[in-house]
Amino acid sequence: MHRIKSKAIKNFLFIFFLIFGHPVYANCNFNTSEYITELQNPKNITKIDITIPDSKKWNKNLLKITLDRSSNINPKYRDKFNSNLKVFYKFGSCSYNARVRISGDWKDHIEFNNGSFKASLDVKLFEGNILNAVRFKLLIPKTRNSINEVIGSLIMREFQIISPETFMTNVSVNNSSSTYIFQENSAKEMLERNLKREGPIFEGNEDLLWSYKDFEIMQLEDISLSRLVNDSWAKKGLTSTLISLNSFIELQKIYLQYQNHEKRSSNQFLDK
């Protein structure tokens, strides 16, 4: 009986977050209240269409990145562009105002085929959400080992490990169509979808890997630890600050222990 009540409460909270977490859908040509369950299933998305009005400036920016001598994407080219985004479902469509920029660190996030650019995107919706995500990435599949990224996410979910919503979908950017990986950002919406309370979210800090000119790329990997993604939550109050700080310290210790273990294992192998 206790398990049944617990499951019922979790289901209620899940639906509550989906409906009231933020304005659920922007401008849709169907009654969203009749499709609440279907709108949370990525299988019902048939296509995402993105139009960047200032397409000339967008393409010029991608060209600059391509011609830049550096092997990684210089932060100065991460300009944000207003866009119109439309999601097509099996039962209708929804339109959003959004902002996009190029995603990724390396130039493999840009392709040029048949006279047009294709790039991985960071997307932010100004209103509503898609599968409860306000911020998400549309990634060129090869940058994440293609379908393996989706499979990995599904496996983690089976083991009840929090993982972002990840799936393949058709995307058109300024009338250039291709297959992309949709992946929600690590944010409070991801925690809500996994029925978790909002808290600190950490990810590997890659800035040290290629942001310092005096060092070779990846030379500082041993001291590249973690960083707090949602620092705004940590600033909400003393309790959230202490939780974030203590979690940050513990995670850094784990990173350092791992690096030390790897070094010892490598040295033992070389000694043999």
Annotate each predicted stretch with a short phrase:
Residues 2-12:
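Bacterial N-terminal signal peptides that target proteins for export
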Residues 42, 77, 115, 144-148, ...:
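Extracytoplasmic/periplasmic, Sec-exported soluble proteins
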Residues 24, 158, 167-168, 268-270:
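Composition- and surface-driven signal marking solvent-exposed, interaction-prone regions
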Residues 187-272:
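ATP-dependent phospho-/nucleotidyl transfer catalytic cores
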Residues 88-220:
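Conserved ATP-binding subdomain of kinase catalytic cores across diverse folds
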Residues 34, 147, 151, 167, ...:
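Extracytoplasmic/secreted proteins, especially bacterial periplasmic and envelope-associated proteins
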Residues 26-97:
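Regulatory N- and C-terminal appendages and interdomain linkers associated
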Residues 11-21:
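Bacterial N-terminal signal peptides
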